Amino acid sequence: MRISMVLIGTSGYNYPHWWNDVFYSSRLPQRKWLEFYAQNFDTVELNVSFYRLSKKETFQSWYKRTPKRFSFAVKGSRFITHIKRLKDCREPLSFFFDHASPLKEKLGAVLWQLPPKFKFQQESLEKFCVLLSTLPRSKLLRHAFEFRDESWYCQEAFRILEEFNFAFCMAHGSVLPFIEKATSDFIYLRLHGGEVLYGSNYSDKELRQWAEKIEHWKETGKIVFVYFNNDAYGFAIKNALTLKKIMQSNSII
């Protein structure tokens, strides 16, 4: 399956406050939400996998209910990132990827979000990246890292990601400053909102500015994953649809 060069979606799709005509029609049953979402977007970031690992049958259902060219980004288990803190992870990683395997070619990327106040540990990051690049079910996948402590914003961390062709997740609206740093052949962008984390709307002007950045990344030959995580009040859906429209009108996608 050839993946699109620019994929725009939201962090999650199953939000009750998106119902009642915010995005989902009040007449649309919840069991059909994913199908409707996939009619409007090419990708979704699955956050549920961070909190609990769904059954293989659930991943298989997501695969069957979405179009051929649809792409999933799966958020890595917090057991691995927040409890194990990247150490001694061979078994939990194997378990995680075994469960996600029914997504097959639709598994576009895996996001590893590290916890706040977790300081940079070079050895842990290197060993974890080696595992990801050698385990049978993960070595061919795209991996992105969202650092939530500024100590990871360093040249040594970026060098390690570049060595393994893993992406530094560019996160806007988080508690950390936005850094535009490409470390792989793909871009992973998370838009959390501006002034209020998860609860700010991006203006059309701001979205046009993001579109220009995305166009630049695309022109350099990179695949770009964009996920809006400002889900409060339906801002994520609104902003994702607007950004997609802006880029389509400019023939960027």
Where are each of the predicted segments found?
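Residues lining hydrophobic/aromatic ligand-binding pockets adjacent to catalytic sites
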Residues: 1-253
